[in-house]
């Protein structure tokens, strides 16, 4: 697959050949969904907690005598049916994370990249560098490229000027190649890769 390369200013800068094994797959929604669910489950705090009947503060004394009242045979006031009683099967502090094989994660990333390429949401730029960290200048560049919602992936190290300038622009995310992931690719309309990012991806999946 061949794709045009543009500069940050919107000028043409040749073309790049993309591997069909990474960008030319027929997207599998089920594999992508598995990876997104894995990511979202892994980042859940899991700090939810409700007190059970063993944890609430209530007296342990029997409420009233066993017989002769005409009422139910209650003992503890800590049971769930009473106000102030413990919650039955309430949430506990736990990890929501589950395992997903590394090969499935790698495949999901390929399918997410292929989905963006298929939908026309993939853009390759020559480099993501700015001499001065000026947000106004970067907004102008993005406007020229038609970017309102985008994930920008650079090489192993981000250009400091570019990263700082992009930090305050809504719906724009900037990540190094090590941080590329399925969820962030899907949550933005466009995926912008630098030539360094393309080379790193092809080296990673070689």
Curated annotation (Swiss-Prot):
One GO-annotated biological process of the protein: translation
Recorded superkingdom: Bacteria
Any one GO MF annotation of this record: structural constituent of ribosome
UniProt KW keywords: Ribonucleoprotein, Ribosomal protein, RNA-binding, rRNA-binding
CC annotations in GO: ribonucleoprotein complex; ribosome
UniProt xrefs under InterPro entries: Ribosomal_uL4, Ribosomal_uL4-like, Ribosomal_uL4_dom_sf
HAMAP family: Ribosomal_uL4_B (MF_01328_B)
Subunit structure and binding partners: Part of the 50S ribosomal subunit.
Protein name as it appears in the record: Large ribosomal subunit protein uL4
Source species of the chain: Rhodopseudomonas palustris (strain BisB18)
Underlying gene: rplD
């Amino acid at each position: 697959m061949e794709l045009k390369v543009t500069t940050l200013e919107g000028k043409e800068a040749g073309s790049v050949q993309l591997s069909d094994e990474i960008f030319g797959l027929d997207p599998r929604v089920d594999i992508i969904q598995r990876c997104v669910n894995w990511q979202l489950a892994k980042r859940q705090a899991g700090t939810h907690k409700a007190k059970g009947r063993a944890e609430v503060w209530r007296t342990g004394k029997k409420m009233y005598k066993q017989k002769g009242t005409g009422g139910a045979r209650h003992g503890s006031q800590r049971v769930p049916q009473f106000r102030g009683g413990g919650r039955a099967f309430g949430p506990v502090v736990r990890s929501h994370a589950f395992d997903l094989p590394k090969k499935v994660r790698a495949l999901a990333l390929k399918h997410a990249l292929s989905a963006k390429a298929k939908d026309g949401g993939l853009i390759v730029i020559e480099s993501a560098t700015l001499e001065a960290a000026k947000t106004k200048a970067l907004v102008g560049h993005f406007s020229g490229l038609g970017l309102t919602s985008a994930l920008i992936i650079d090489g192993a190290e981000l250009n400091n000027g570019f990263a700082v300038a992009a930090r305050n622009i809504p719906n724009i995310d900037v990540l190094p190649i090590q941080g590329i992931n399925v969820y962030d690719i899907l949550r933005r309309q466009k995926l912008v890769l630098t030539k360094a990012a393309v080379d790193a991806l092809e080296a990673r999946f070689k």
